[in-house]
Amino acid sequence: MKKQFAVMFCLLAIFTCLVGCSGKTESLFPSAFVRAVGQEKADALKTLGTTEQALSDYTVDVYGKTADVQLSFDAYRGDETSAGKLNYAELTVPCTPNGDGFSYMRTCYNKLEKALGEPFTTDVNMDGVSAEDDTDTLFAALQKDAGGENICALQYQWRGLGENESLLYLYYYPNEDGSARVKLTFLPKERAQIP
């Protein structure tokens, strides 16, 4: 009887540990990061497949060299020392269609831009679009590069970063109820398999 009780107690302890530990698997933002970008922006950014230390290293490298601290395009791009330390990040914002497809996408883009911190079209290079082009040109390229009925994706590629060259993807997902969301995804070179 005592043996059975001991076995049951051990099983209960294991179960309790599993339940108690399961909520700790999601990576938390370092307090320095939250203070730097604000709680609202920190809540908007969801990190997947990264560790707290990696995110901390990344933000220290980026924000330590940025006078105007904000969650912006430059923060995703990083630089030669910080790019690639963040394994994966995405930001999703809701948006509602208005008029034609271009206006629809533009609305989503504006919301994403606002969530990240404006502007975020500098230092961007992609096929046929230079860093000097305005957001309308970039947005037209996004619409032209539609990858399918339900996804419109634009690939940003930063050059001149050597082994830390990275990619940024902007995805547009329409929902059945007429709303939509836009997702921004950063991938370092080793994850994106850049040739």
Regions found by a protein language model. Give the residues of each.
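Long, charged/polar, surface-exposed segments that mediate recognition or autoinhibition
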Residues: 67-154
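Short, recurring structural edge motifs at helix starts
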Residues: 27-34, 96-99
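Post-signal-peptide N-terminal segment of Sec-exported extracytoplasmic proteins
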Residues: 40-66
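Bacterial signal peptide processing site
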Residues: 22-24
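A glycine-biased structural micro-motif
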Residues: 35-39
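Positively charged n-region of N-terminal signal peptides that target proteins for export
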Residues: 1-7, 11
